[in-house]
Amino acid sequence: MKKFVIEREKLKENARIIEKKAGVPVFAVLKADGYGFGMKQMAEILKETGIRMFAVTEPEDAQRLRDWGYTEEDILVMRSTAMADEAYQVVQANAIATVGSPEAAQCLNEVAQGCGMQAKAHVKIDTGMGRYGFLPDQYAEIKKVYTACPGIQVTGIYTHFHSSFADEAATRGQYKQLCHIISQLEADGICVGMRHAANSNGVFRYDDMMLDAVRVGSAFTGRIVNGAKYGLSRLGYLESRVIETRTVPKGHTFGYGAGYVAKDTTRVAVVPVGYTDGFSVEKKRDLFRPRDVMRYVKNDLEDGRGKGNIYISIAGHRVRVLGHVGLCHVSCDVTGLDIKNGDTAILDVNPLYLSPLVTKEYV
């Protein structure tokens, strides 16, 4: 038996810390099924803490939230789109669209007018993320969304920080570009609506960038750079159990490719968890710059992987995985420890890579 366990109180406490630090309304970002934790459950718990605004990337997720009873909450769809079917979904869900291009503005305007409605929207400025958003030098086009689209009621403006966890100069540069656009609009007599820029790391690093709201996702899970330093608890763990213990002689090998050779007589615990369950699975590393390489090296050294080591917890003991992680199993060195069959094993996994066969349990 294995399950991914999520502690409700940890999530609530993280939310309280975030809301206090922000000091302004918080958009709870629930993209990718709530970062793998379950969008429906995350929304329920965060609403209990006072969250009244949500953000998603997919138009259908906005409708799901409405269907689950979130009829009064603001829901921001953070993905700009020039596809009429997606714009229609946003309008029908009474969600807030993101407009990040002249094409997206035209599409949303036409769809909303065709529905006999006025769609709410936030204008997005691309200050360096490179995906969605008007470029800062497209001021004329940005202004038209406010003044020349009768089917759109612009209620906000925002940007997306790309390096708020590490690069202060770049982040401040992005913020400055957004503020410049806002100043231009206001100078032309336009009420820009809700202004927001700070994301999960931005909330904790830049007190002067909170504006009217913030957008927070991964910080709710405690899985951000320096999360513990900010008082956040890491949310979620994979729970399994020891199904067999055995003793092998010196020289015995472990895993495909005989990745480890026992240096002495070794007592082993077998746990039925592998990369099919998301254990030891991670996204491909981005190694575009030397500092990216150094960051991964630093992290690996801190958690033991710099020496090829992977650890899990069994009955409260930190134990080493022997050999390569298999599809469905791992063998662990429990020599000298009072560990027996049935003992609980705790493993750290990214819930985005969990097998759909693994049950999520909120406790």
Q: What kind of region is each of these model predictions?
A:
Residues 2-6, 10-13, 23-196:
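Active-site-proximal beta-alpha core segment in soluble small-molecule metabolic enzymes
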Residues 3-6, 12, 175-363:
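Active-site anion/phosphate-binding pocket segments in diverse small-molecule metabolic enzymes
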